[in-house]
Regions:
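Conserved GNAT acetyl-CoA-binding A-motif
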Residues: 59-69, 198-209
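Short amphipathic alpha-helix that is part of the acyltransferase structural core
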Residues: 1-7, 39-43, 91-93, 98-140, ...
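Conserved beta-strand-loop-alpha-helix junction that forms the acyl-donor binding cleft
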Residues: 66-74, 179, 208-218, 235-238
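A conserved beta-strand-loop-helix scaffold within acyl/acetyltransferase catalytic domains
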Residues: 132, 136-178
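Acyl-donor-binding surface of acyltransferase catalytic domains
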Residues: 45-119, 235-236
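Conserved catalytic-core motifs of GNAT/GCN5-like acyltransferases
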Residues: 86-97, 207-209, 218, 222, ...
Length: 238
């Protein structure tokens, strides 16, 4: 139940422009946003693959399934493999107690705002190279309490991240550090700010999703108390 809840909290923290629920399956379409925002969440044991494929075909988009072991039907991954879906993007879902993050982060907290500032978005865009106007739209759809944290060096925003609180959990998203500021504690400062905000909102646990190949992120989160609760991946057909 925890894994399903966390993946759904994460989906609500990165809300697609269009979502249809079919039983426990979330069919999502969000042109202009990061590809994973449109991934299907197949969160019950029914076979709704054809329905999901039709949903995506009607909207002219590729089909992507987020495969979380223990949440999806046990044979879904193999069935998608048999239908020609490629496996990609090995991911790690990690959790920590908020108090542990605050203990381990060893950094002065950065600043927090309730909405993304232009400076926050500029720093985010320069690292991710994604479309700012699409991201503004996505962030405006988030319904749960949110925090936007940033760290500055000489008056310039050099690292950003955001958190969304739901049901006692704060999810961490959008962590980005400018290349010249990496390895200097800026990301830790952002994480400290988000953890402080989470604690003040009585979100006593934190979670995040990260690509397993991201060794820099792995080191940061390993050292700040986040431990893996599951691996998951995507099945993709374009």
């Amino acid at each position: 139940v925890l894994l399903k809840s966390l993946q759904e909290y994460a989906a609500r923290a990165q809300p697609a422009a269009h979502v249809e629920e079919a039983g426990g399956w979330w069919l999502r379409h969000s042109p202009g946003d990061a590809w994973w925002v449109s991934a299907v969440l197949p969160h019950d044991r029914e076979d709704r693959v054809t329905l999901a494929e039709e949903f995506c075909a009607e909207r002219g988009s590729g089909v992507r399934f987020q495969i979380t072991p223990g949440v999806c039907a046990d044979d879904l991954d193999a069935r998608l493999d048999g239908r020609g879906y490629a496996r990609g993007h090995d991911m790690s879902l990690r959790i920590a107690s908020t108090s542990e993050v605050l203990r381990q982060v060893h950094a002065d907290a950065g600043e927090v705002t309730a909405r993304p500032t232009d400076e926050w978005l500029t720093a985010w865009q320069s690292v991710t190279t994604r479309d700012v106007s699409a991201e503004r739209d996505l962030l405006s759809r988030v319904e749960h309490p949110s925090a936007y944290a940033y760290a500055e060096v000489d008056g310039q925003v050099v690292a950003v991240g955001r958190a969304v609180a739901e049901q006692g959990w704060a999810g961490v998203f959008g962590m980005a550090t400018l290349p010249q500021a990496r390895g200097q504690g800026a990301a830790r400062s952002v994480l400290a700010a988000l953890a402080s905000w989470a604690a003040a909102r009585e979100a006593n646990h934190m979670y995040l999703q990260m690509e397993k190949a991201n060794s820099t992120a792995f080191r940061l989160y390993e050292r700040t108390g986040f431990r893996e609760v599951c691996s998951y991946h995507y099945r993709i057909r374009t």
